[in-house]
């Protein structure tokens, strides 16, 4: 995907980012990106643990059955 990028391409991209955001804002931007990535990784790991737990308990759950109570209420 990014195999065609060389060092010069990355240097130009970095220069454009510096021009757009300015040097003083970059540390705050990097901090917020790092926090977002940490939260994302935590959520992914939590979902994996939940998936493993479900597999250990038998996998799927039984679907809910309709008792017909809701259709009786709508007809009144």
Swiss-Prot record:
It is found in: Cell membrane. One of its GO terms (cellular component) is TAT protein transport complex. The keyword Membrane applies. Pfam families: TatA_B_E (PF02416). Its main location: membrane. Keywords: Cell membrane, Membrane, Protein transport, Translocation, Transmembrane, Transmembrane helix, Transport. GO terms for biological process: protein transport by the Tat complex. Residues 44-57 have a biased composition (Basic and acidic residues). One of its GO terms (molecular function) is protein transmembrane transporter activity. It comes from the Bacteria. The Tat system comprises two distinct complexes: a TatABC complex, containing multiple copies of TatA, TatB and TatC subunits, and a separate TatA complex, containing only TatA subunits. Substrates initially bind to the TatABC complex, which probably triggers association of the separate TatA complex to form the active translocon. Belongs to the TatA/E family. Part of the twin-arginine translocation (Tat) system that transports large folded proteins containing a characteristic twin-arginine motif in their signal peptide across membranes. TatA could form the protein-conducting channel of the Tat system. This is Sec-independent protein translocase protein TatA. It comes from Leifsonia xyli subsp. xyli (strain CTCB07). The lineage of its organism: Bacteria, Bacillati, Actinomycetota, Actinomycetes, Micrococcales.
